[in-house]
Design a protein with these regions (language model features):
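Long, contiguous secondary-structure blocks with strong helical propensity
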Residues: 6, 40-58, 94-96, 113-124
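Flexible, glycine/proline-enriched loop segments at strand-loop-helix junctions
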Residues: 26-30, 102-106, 151
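Short capping/connector residues at structural and topological boundaries
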Residues: 32, 114, 141-143
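Context-gated lysine
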Residues: 11, 16, 42, 51, ...
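Short, charged low-complexity linear segments at domain edges
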Residues: 1-15
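Thiamine diphosphate
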Residues: 5-6, 63-151
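Active-site diphosphate/adenylate-binding microenvironment
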Residues: 11-13, 17-79
Length: 151
């Protein structure tokens, strides 16, 4: 059995830049997604106890769904609203991975609402970040489910 001191020494040590990909971030100036990305990169660096490659970010369609491109981890940019379904499949096949779903209010609650509900019903170990920008950022013709007033 490995003594506790050895386990601490074998734990990977990361800094925020270890989770920053080389991709140019393509969000509008002032977008709140920048803050979410920065906090996630810093949080994973501070608290992860596993290899960086064991984190997977899965997204659908929308502004926030470009997230996997900006994380230096594995990731999928999937089809509109289906990220929870794909994440469920991945977690079932590879339960050792830390699987994150990043989705927006339109992607995750409009077209993907049923997939989100079923992922929660299945109660598997997914981590879901739902970004609520309260605007139809990608499709300006539709209101999303969390919009409090008509725009």
């Amino acid at each position: 059995m490995t003594p506790p001191e050895a386990a601490v020494q074998n734990k990977p040590h990361y800094i925020k830049d270890d989770f920053v990909s080389g991709q140019d971030v393509r969000w509008c100036p002032g977008c709140g997604d920048y803050a979410i990305l920065s906090v996630m990169q810093k949080t994973l660096a501070d608290f992860t106890t596993t290899k960086r490659e064991n984190h997977v970010f899965i997204s659908g369609i929308g502004c926030s769904s470009r997230f996997p491109y900006y994380m230096n981890t594995y990731g999928f940019h999937t089809i509109h609203g289906r990220a929870p379904a794909i994440a469920t499949g991945l977690k079932c096949v590879r339960p050792d991975l830390t699987v994150w779903v990043i989705t927006g209010d339109g992607d995750g609650l409009s077209i993907g609402g049923n997939h989100l509900i079923h992922a929660m019903r299945r109660n598997i170990d997914l981590k879901i970040i739902l970004v609520n920008n309260q605007r139809p950022a990608v499709n300006s013709k539709k209101n999303n489910p969390l919009l409090t007033t008509n725009h």
